[in-house]
């Protein structure tokens, strides 16, 4: 695990003419769910394109600990699932490392079973609140033991028979919605989730693909009601995981802000609940061509061609936040090179990510000469076209707080700043995008990692 290892700073320097074609690693959301649903479904599931970052592998290990058989042959992961309702009690605590998604979804999946399951994680995950997932599980009859503030370690024990509930999700959170639906898989009757604002819908699409009896209705106000019939049969599937739009964001923004760049990114997931960043960048004047649109496994996929663009500041509509919550750090970097002011509101979710992502972004921008204001749930960035004066002539490292997206965002910033940008640690990039350094330097980006000092 990289989180226990020595931090390894990295520095990005002004680059030009980033060029090439790349394939982004598989989508993290779909990869987590592929392991989970494949491990739960009866029969064999085959997965290609899986994101093999630490977070997803930890989800796979958790499914193995509960009875799924998982092996890799060539580029294909093959899972023999246990069958819905047939998970086994894990003999040891389930360690999710840094993976909030894997941890919260698995709590829903296994929490309603009539046995004890214990969840642990790394220092970053142990600080993150789990109450939003634990509250609906309590309503279903699950007994919860947790550290103060509903934090890890958490031990769950389901009732003899869980109660199906109707749960209105109090905030825009795909993780909470998904956890309740997954708990509903082993609950008799109909479990209903009411979602006031649509969030990423991979759980619904994929559960339907695996054979769950799940329906979605959307009313005139956009409120979605999702109903799942519990204890039905799930059957193994063949899945080709499309490229992760959140990882795509880094080479995409690099191509926009580095002069002379022309990059093509293949096989990108274009699910409408995930494309807020692309839409926002296009509104800022980004030259992004969407090519070869197609469907893969019920999901929209396309190739993107991105070229260097003169960006202009915009006000991002607040209701777009759920569709790009993970992309605000790298959007803030793009805004630092745009003409004028970019205003981002509705960012309260960023306070409870791997780090307090909002203050981490604002602090990193200020350190590197960007004029910005951090509000309670907002960020205002006043850009400097061409990156004049941005970066650091000497010393000064961006504090990443063990957060992979902060690290990658600021390394992208350094590629177009007048002076270099250094992050205090790049080891945790492996949690979501292990190939980041290799792909970026392959395009011509000047990024160097510090040598590992002997411990």
Curated annotation (Swiss-Prot):
Region (Disordered): 1-23
Active site: 326
Pfam families in the record: EPSP_synthase (PF00275)
Subcellular localization: Cytoplasm
GO biological process: amino acid biosynthetic process; aromatic amino acid family biosynthetic process; chorismate biosynthetic process
Major site of localization recorded for this protein: cytoplasm
Keywords: Amino-acid biosynthesis, Aromatic amino acid biosynthesis, Cytoplasm, Transferase
MF-aspect GO terms: 3-phosphoshikimate 1-carboxyvinyltransferase activity
Listed EC numbers: 2.5.1.19
GO cellular-component term (any): cytoplasm
Top-rank taxon: Bacteria
InterPro entries for the chain: Enolpyruvate_Tfrase_dom (IPR001986), Enolpyruvate_Tfrase_sf (IPR036968), EPSP_synthase (IPR006264), EPSP_synthase_CS (IPR023193), RNA3'P_cycl/enolpyr_Trfase_a/b (IPR013792)
Residues binding 3-phosphoshikimate, per UniProt: 28-29, 33, 173, 175, 326, 353
Subunit structure: Monomer.
Protein name in UniProt: 3-phosphoshikimate 1-carboxyvinyltransferase
Species this protein is from: Rhizobium meliloti (strain 1021) (Ensifer meliloti)
Organism ancestry: Bacteria, Pseudomonadati, Pseudomonadota, Alphaproteobacteria, Hyphomicrobiales
Gene behind this protein: aroA
């Amino acid at each position: 695990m990289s989180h226990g290892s020595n931090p390894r700073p990295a520095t990005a320097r002004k680059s030009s003419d980033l060029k090439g074609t790349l394939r982004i690693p598989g989508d993290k959301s779909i990869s987590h769910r592929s392991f989970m649903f494949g491990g739960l479904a009866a029969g064999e599931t085959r997965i290609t394109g899986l994101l093999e970052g630490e977070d997803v592998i930890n989800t796979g290990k958790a499914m193995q600990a509960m009875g799924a058989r998982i092996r890799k042959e060539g580029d294909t992961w093959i899972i023999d699932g246990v069958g819905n309702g047939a998970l086994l009690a894990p003999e040891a605590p389930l360690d999710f490392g840094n993976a909030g998604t894997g941890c919260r979804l698995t709590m829903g999946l296994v929490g309603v079973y009539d046995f004890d399951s214990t969840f642990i994680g790394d220092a970053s995950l142990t600080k993150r609140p789990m109450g939003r997932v634990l509250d609906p599980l309590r309503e279903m009859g699950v007994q919860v033991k947790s550290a103060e503030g509903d934090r890890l370690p958490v031990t769950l024990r389901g009732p003899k028979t869980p109660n199906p509930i109707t749960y209105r999700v109090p905030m825009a959170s795909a993780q909470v919605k998904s956890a309740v639906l997954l708990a509903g898989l082993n609950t008799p009757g109909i479990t209903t989730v009411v979602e006031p604002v649509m969030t990423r819908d991979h759980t619904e699409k994929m559960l339907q693909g695996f054979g769950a009896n799940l329906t979605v209705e959307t009313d005139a106000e956009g409120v979605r009601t999702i109903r799942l019939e519990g204890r039905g049969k799930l059957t193994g599937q063949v899945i080709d995981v499309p490229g992760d739009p959140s990882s795509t964001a880094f080479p995409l923004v690099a191509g926009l802000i580095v002069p002379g760049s022309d990059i093509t990114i293949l096989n990108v997931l274009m699910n409408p609940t995930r494309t807020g960043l692309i839409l926002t960048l296009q509104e800022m004047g980004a030259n992004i061509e969407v090519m070869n649109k197609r469907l893969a496994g019920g999901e929209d996929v396309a190739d993107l061609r991105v070229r260097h663009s003169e960006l202009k500041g915009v006000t991002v509509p607040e209701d777009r936040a759920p569709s790009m919550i993970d992309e605000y750090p790298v959007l803030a970097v793009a805004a630092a090179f745009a003409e004028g002011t970019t205003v981002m509101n509705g960012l309260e979710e960023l306070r409870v990510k791997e780090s307090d992502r909002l203050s981490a972004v604002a602090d990193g921008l200020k350190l590197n000469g960007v004029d910005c204001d951090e509000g309670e749930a907002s960020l205002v960035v006043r850009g400097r076209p061409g990156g004049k004066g941005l970066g650091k002539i000497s010393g000064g490292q961006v504090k990443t707080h063990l957060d992979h997206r902060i690290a990658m965002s600021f390394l992208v910033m350094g590629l177009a700043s007048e002076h270099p940008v250094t992050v205090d640690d790049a080891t945790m990039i492996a949690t979501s995008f292990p190939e980041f350094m290799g792909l970026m330097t392959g395009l011509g980006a000047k990024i160097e990692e510090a040598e590992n000092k002997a411990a």
